[in-house]
Every structure is written in C-alpha cells, then in structure tokens.
Amino acid sequence: MSYLLALDAGTGSVRAVIFDLHGNQISVGQAEWKHLSVENVPGSMEFDLDTNWRLACQCIHQALERAHLNAADIQSVACCSMREGIVLYDRNGDAIWACANVDARASREVAELKEIHDYRFESEVYDVSGQTLALSAMPRLLWLAHHRPDIYRNAATITMISDWLAAKLSGELAVDPSNAGTTGMLDLFSRDWRPALLDMAGLRADILSPVKETGTVLGAVTKAAASQSGLREGTPVVMGGGDVQLGCLGLGVVRAGQTAVLGGTFWQQVVNLPQVRTDPDMNIRVNPHVIPGMAQAESISFFTGLTMRWFRDAFCAEEKLIAERMGMDAYALLEEMANRVPAGSHGVMPIFSDAMHFKQWYHAAPSFINLSIDPEKCNKATLFRALEENAAIVSACNLAQISRFSGVTFESLVFAGGGAKGALWSQILSDVTGLPVRVPEVKEATALGCAIAAGTGAGLYNDMAATGEKLVKWSREFTPNPEHRELYDGMMQKWQAVYADQLGLVDSGLTTSMWQAPGLVRVPSPRPSP
C-alpha cells in the first residue's frame, strides 16, 4: 500500500504525519521546539536550525516506527510551516540565519519603512502583496543590514521555513506563493516576486529564490537526508506551503466564496475570493491560496485559544481535577456548565481581541466588562460562555469586513481546529453568524492538505482541489437558532462601542494593550482632566 508523509513546522512544535491515499491518518511523530531570544535584542525569536532539523528527523523516525512502515512505503513527502518565518542561505546553499513568525525585533525598521514615499510605502506594499509591514520580511532584512551586516552581506537566498525543510530533504531551494506571499515581497496577482519593493526599501533584490506552485515536484530525498531522516533516498519531495492555506485544502475549502474559521491559539477567518483583490481600507490581509490563481482574504482574532487556556488554568483548578477524575477533558466539562447559562451570558462582555485592523493593528487591555456581583448570574460558567460568545462575535465582525470589500455573501462556514471540538462553541458560532456550520472529522487538516500536495506531485492524485473535496469527511453540522439572532446582533453592537472606549484607555496610557503590531505609532486620544 502507498503512503504519504507531511512534515509540518508549527510555531510551537514540529510534526511528521503519515496518511494513506484515502486521507486516513496512520501515525504522527511530534516534538515541541522553542525559539531563541537573543540577548539585548528585544522581541527577537530566532529559529534554531540545527536543533530543529534534528527534531524534524526524530519525528519522521517516530512516525515510521509507530505506523510499522518501511521507508520504501512512503511514496512522496511535502513540507508546510507557520507563515512569516524566514531563512537566509549563503552562496553554497547553507542556511545561515532564521527567525520564527513571532520575531518582533524590527519595530524601528517598520516605522522607518513606513516613512518612504511620504508615508505611502506601506499602502503600496499592501496593494501589491496583500500584506502590511508589521509581519513582512522587509523590516527584518533591514534590521540585519543595520545590526548584523555580516549575515546580510553573506545572504544569497531567502526562503520560508517550510522550504528550508524541503531543502534539507532535497538540496533544492525554492518557495511557493502561499507561504512566500506573507513576506510582503511577492505579487499577489502574478504569484511571483516583486523585486521593485525591495529596491524601494533600499534592500537587495538578488536574494529571491525560484517560485514553484504547491503540488509541483521540487526534487528527491538526497543520500545525506535519507541517512538522517530515515526516508528512502530518491523519494519525491514536493512543494508544500503555508499552514492555513494547506489547512483549507485539507478541509475542502477550495472554491470561490467558501469560508472557514480555524480555531486555534489564534482564530483565522478565511474566505476564498472570487477574484484577486485587496481591501481599500487595509483592514484585512490577503494571501495567495495553494490553489493556483486563487487568493484568500484572512482576518485574525488574537489569542482566542490562548485566552481560553488562561481562563481554564487561572480559575478552573477544581474543574480540571473533576474532569481528570471523570476521564474527560476540562474544556468539555466547562462547556457542560456553560450550556446551562442563557444565551447572552447575563450581559458580560469580554474585552480581549479586537476585530482585525491590519493597517492600525492593536488591542485593548484584557478585561471583563459588565460583571454582576450576583453569584447565580456571574460565575465561572457565565464567564466561560461569555468568552465563547465573544470569540464568535469577533469572528462575525471580521467576516463582515471581508464581505464588505469582497462582495462575497456567505452561505455556510467550516469550523475546524481545537475550538471546533466543543459542540456549544460550534452552535454559538452558528447562532452569532447566522450561518450553518460544518465541523470536519480530520484533526490534522494542515497535514492532510500537505499530504494531498505530496500525492499530487507524485502523480497519485490528478487534482489537488478535487482531492481535498473528496477526502474531507464531516463530523457534525449546526444550524443557527433564529431565536438568538436579535440578541446576538445587539450584543455585537454594544461590544463594538465598549471596545472602542477601551482602546481609548490604551491610547491615553491608562491601560496596556494586549498586543500591538511592531512599529505601530498611535496618537493618544485627548481625554478630559479629572
């Protein structure tokens, strides 16, 4: 029997996942990794190339052993990763520096680049690439030019972290549009580099590697890589891509107008656009899909999953113990409790992530507003439900922004990731958005999408998009409760007004933003003196 291997480099861990050709997950090898903070470099988060390659190889060995497979059973390999993380190589093709997606050292360089063309440069970058400077590769390259000229001068090629893994396996350097698109240096419309953007930024444009579409063959596993990874020499290595876009492929979200909410540490609201375009208000990010010729509007809710974990760990020690004794997940127990709280959570309004404003991206200080001192109305179950409702409200706000600039009218959405495990959360998302919600069976949608790319490149599948639609299986479906629509519409309007006031407190220096984009310059709002 034939099998496919996906190597998935996430923010906090690396996974090697083996699938059969029917999309069934056979085994997984996983290892956590940590990124390196450089002394005296605030916001730095370097990617440990040597250690992380060893961990990736370890995961491949684990996956093969757990599946009881030989290397010859793996017909093809592809790699995917977190977006925004970049790797630089010297003229010999050896990696010399890398940073993770969360590296925020270049705040000053972001501000410096924004001043170009009388403060129009960021808009020019966005119009071409769908990206702003905050997460772009250009400020990081400029930081290296300023602070590590030895690395900058020696850099001959740039790729993404997924491409680094593929290069370690095959010896071939290239990027794909879905991941490289997040550098802010790739043309969203042509799906190729735009060297003029680097020229305008005063950066070298001779470091841009070849662009190959997801699902095309890059090379084959080398003898050296085979000895380290346990894979068979000569196994095809196929172009992978960005984690979110490949996740959409694994969910069958491959047609124009289709919509997904991916619920993890961050929540992404993703919409396949009928035509490639950007948002005139610069609120929404636009990325190349792994489907050739297609772009995705992507909005992001910050720390949604992390907020739930904080609430569980900070306030629900008793529930964690009870859940452990009952042999169930603590979140499932908290959902049971929250299910007894009426819709609207007695008016409690969580203030955590704002809706996405890509050009001016920051959030209020975390808080709960409108608490009651009645313990029957305001307790852990109430706050947990309020957090779930708020995550759905932020998602609905983000989807509304996408609809306004794209003209897409949503018919349904796919809900996947850790958040989708909760039946209550899935129902709340349906009620708040007014859309039918489908939850897939697959637990590793990104890895499955990556495996589909691997199989397509090896000739085992004829078409990536058609295969994604064929292999996805649905676990549950939820329909909106019309009785809750008016309530949630009113809650959304109130929350938006309250959140705007909370941002005013941040602007005045009275509270601290939960997160703000690197290089953001805010003008404090005038407030009356006491």
Swiss-Prot record:
Keywords of the record: Cytoplasm, Kinase, Transferase
HAMAP family: LsrK
Record-given protein name: Autoinducer-2 kinase
GO molecular function, one term: autoinducer-2 kinase activity
Pfam families: FGGY_C, FGGY_N
UniProt keyword Cytoplasm, yes or no: yes
InterPro entries hit by this protein: AI-2_kinase, ATPase_NBD, Carb_kinase_FGGY, FGGY_C, FGGY_Carb_Kinase, FGGY_N
